[in-house]
Amino acid sequence: MPTPTKGARLGGSPAHERLLLANLATALFEHGGITTTEAKAKRLRPYAERLVTFAKRGDLHARRRVMRQVRDNSVVHTLFTEIGPRYANRNGGYTRIVKIGNRKGDNAPLARIELVEALTVGQQAVSEAERARGTRFEARRKPTGATVEAAEELAQESPTAAAVAVEAAEPAETPAEGAAGKPTTAQTDDSGIGDDSGAGEQNSAN
């Protein structure tokens, strides 16, 4: 069996490693960034950047070379029409790796590998949809420890937080205001005690 020359082998066999890298590259070009183990991210980086170099060429032979590894036609189309032209004036360094700590459970070191420049239009739409799905129920929560001005600024940035600003702007009735018109039990007891003592003094005088 040939010895790997670019780091530890991924998977159980060379064929498994090729399929694993191809799937990771497909996910990277589709979403703009993925979270995986640090070892896989380091092996994926030169693999993905070589495919971006083929996409920058843009000819038919380069497209066929990429399609031997990336089998998703929509991802190949995105790679050649959006990602490749984006790096026309950049010679290498198309991705970055950010370490994000260890995974809970097996304590494997995790890393995020992503494309270095802005997302494409399709990737921005996907990220906005995921963000909207995650903040769908934020309107029911009241801001804790934040001022009304901060809530209004947040409402300008996110439409889903508009209800939060409206709820924060409404003045809440304090318990002191609600109990201002009602005499307390202590006051009632004191007044009753004073009346009984006065009546006792009048009876003794008579």
Swiss-Prot record:
In what ranges is there compositional bias, type Low complexity? 160-181, 189-200
Q: What's a GO cellular component annotated to this UniProt protein?
A: cytosolic large ribosomal subunit
Superkingdom to which the source organism belongs: Bacteria
Sequence ranges of Basic and acidic residues compositional bias: 130-141
**InterPro entries, sorted:** Ribosomal_bL17, Ribosomal_bL17_CS, Ribosomal_bL17_sf
Tell me which Gene Ontology terms the entry assigns under biological process: translation
PANTHER family per the UniProt record, alphabetical: LARGE RIBOSOMAL SUBUNIT PROTEIN BL17M (PTHR14413:SF16), RIBOSOMAL PROTEIN L17 (PTHR14413)
The name on file for this protein is Large ribosomal subunit protein bL17
| Upper taxonomic lineage | Bacteria, Bacillati, Actinomycetota, Actinomycetes, Frankiales
